[in-house]
């Protein structure tokens, strides 16, 4: 990895040290001349991680018994909600009964989109309007957050309301005030464990406050995307309180709709996605799915179920991923620490899991940092992408994804310098 001298035109730098400025320009130009091609824009598993799941491809062959424990033939139609073997280990992740789990295709994002689309056209709760009939409908978007979440609700013409993130998760004072006083607010996006991009895990208090919400809208829903539920990268992993368990205590089991997938466990694009919700929610969701699909890829479900066995099998497999990812995160964090700590030009997260390191540079410089990195051959997530409508009000947040570049790339981090742009 090389992220070099990326903001080198600051008036401050010129005032303080013309010599240092010239040295940074020279260093940056030197890096540009190396012809780097490093992609750190999205949380894609690297080839070394993909190879960990190669044995999955050998689980099913022409002589394999494709009948489930309950007698379903995975080669045929049927089993709208998925096979029991798969539902069982997803139920452990979600902390729900297997009957409240629906196993889908390869994409949890697809299931989230379908869920919003379904609620747009049919009432979530009897007596409520379909969301498309709600004028000035709104959705809460903790930010910085996941750009593809925001894009779904933007596509359906929701007003996206940013909610500040804290070290404990979304600012619950803001969430409670908005949700409990505005019935046009229909939901909130959440990545509760190792959030994208901050790597924060919601505190116990935050989870409990979510479970205790008293929304003005009866059809308000928490879109709980637990994408990184087993994705630790250190030996001190975070623990996430069970939202559904807390909702049972408060009588709010209809609030959350939960999602996850094996996309960053086995093969992205060829994994298995799942969702879970209360009986009431699942009745609405399944009623819509029955018009949409007969069944998803049960052979892939069977392949995954037999490969892992249960949640313990998943956790053992994730230890292999941790062994690959941990040094990659350390490379990024050590570079930031050694090159930027003393400059006062940036702050960054040090997550225990997930796929990202979030860097906050000086206000008004993130776009320029990303642009200059790209010119130097390092592709980062577009500045602003982690905020609704792609607009970071401070132009300061940059998401770094360490997973995709191999460890044998040149590792000579120099200065990721965040200075103000422009020169008089």
Question: What do these predicted ranges mean?
Answer:
Residues 10-81, 92, 375-378:
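N-terminal "arm"/small-domain region of PLP-dependent enzymes with the aminotransferase-like
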Residues 104, 245-326:
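Conserved core segment of the aminotransferase class I/II
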């Amino acid at each position: 990895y090389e992220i070099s001298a990326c903001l080198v035109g600051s008036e401050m730098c010129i005032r303080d040290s013309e010599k240092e400025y010239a040295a940074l320009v020279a260093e940056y130009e030197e890096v540009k001349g190396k012809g780097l091609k490093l992609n750190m824009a999205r949380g894609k598993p690297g080839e070394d991680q993909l190879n960990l799941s190669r044995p999955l491809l050998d689980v099913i062959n022409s002589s394999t018994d494709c009948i489930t424990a309950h007698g379903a033939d995975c080669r045929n139609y049927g089993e709208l909600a998925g096979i029991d073997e798969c539902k069982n280990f997803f139920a452990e992740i979600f902390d729900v009964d297997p009957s409240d789990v629906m196993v889908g295709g390869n994409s949890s994002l697809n299931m989230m989109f379908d869920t919003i689309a379904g609620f747009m056209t049919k009432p979530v709760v009897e007596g409520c309007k379909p969301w498309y009939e709600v004028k000035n409908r709104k959705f809460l978007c903790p930010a910085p957050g996941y750009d593809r979440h925001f894009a779904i609700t933007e596509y359906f013409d929701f007003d996206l309301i940013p909610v500040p993130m804290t070290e404990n998760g979304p600012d619950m004072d803001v969430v409670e005030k908005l949700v409990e006083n505005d019935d046009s607010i229909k939901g909130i996006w959440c990545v509760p464990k190792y959030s994208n991009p901050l790597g924060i895990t919601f505190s116990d208090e935050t989870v409990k406050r979510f479970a205790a919400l008293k929304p003005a809208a009866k059809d308000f829903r928490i879109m709980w995307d637990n994408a990184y539920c087993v994705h630790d990268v250190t030996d001190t992993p975070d623990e996430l309180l069970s939202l559904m368990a807390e909702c049972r205590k408060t009588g709010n089991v209809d609030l959350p709709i939960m999602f996850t997938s094996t996309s960053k466990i086995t093969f992205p694009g060829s994994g298995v996605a799942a969702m879970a919700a209360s009986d009431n929610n699942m009745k609405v969701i399944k009623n819509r799915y029955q018009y949409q699909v007969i069944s998803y890829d049960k052979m892939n479900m069977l392949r995954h179920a037999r490969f892992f066995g249960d949640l313990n099998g998943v956790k053992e497999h994730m230890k292999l991923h941790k062994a690959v990812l941990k040094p990659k995160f350390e490379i990024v964090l050590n570079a930031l620490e050694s090159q930027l700590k003393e400059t006062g030009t940036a702050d960054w997260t040090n997550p225990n899991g997930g796929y990202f390191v979030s860097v906050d540079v000086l206000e008004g410089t993130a776009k320029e940092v990303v642009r200059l990195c790209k010119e130097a051959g390092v592709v980062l997530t577009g500045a602003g992408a982690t905020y609704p409508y792609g607009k970071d009000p401070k132009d300061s947040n940059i998401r770094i994804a360490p997973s995709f570049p191999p460890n044998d790339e040149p590792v000579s981090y120099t200065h990721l310098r965040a200075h103000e742009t422009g020169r008089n």
